[in-house]
Amino acid sequence: FKTSTININEISHALEITETEVSDNEEKDFLRGIVTFGNNNASDIMQSKNEIYSISIDSSFVDVIDKISKSKYSRIPVFKQNIESIVGVLHVKDLLPYIEMDNFNWKKKLREPFFVTEDKKLDKLILEFQEKRIHLAVVLDNEGNTCGVVSLEDVIEEIVGDITDEFD
């Protein structure tokens, strides 16, 4: 019984050959996603800090409900003072039982943020998402400053292509 090791260059070459024979662009993109997945970093696919939909820790419950009702996101970073200091992640589903209330201490429903460095490889990141059972990571630069966020959906889309949901 003989075993062999296939490296990424051989897979890339096989993909090039396959691309001439496969007519379906979705199939080609899927194969390309598999090949390039492990080479990409969190910073390659993250949503930059200027695009992060977030909530201030100082927001009232009414303001939070108003903001999430206008949002397409189910997990929202919460910051203190500015986006550089993310203190938690709010899961919209955690507020559903309290949505009819006029006032609620929503801060007690915050979840611990998960931080990763911008050079975190996607193949490692997807394993951490799975292990920690979370869907959102805050991406930090080399100085520890927030530079963006990346979701599990973003990582999966690198393999399978765009996932269209009710908000896309």
Q: Where in this protein do the model-derived segments appear?
A:
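Soluble cytosolic regulatory domains appended to membrane proteins
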Residues: 4-168
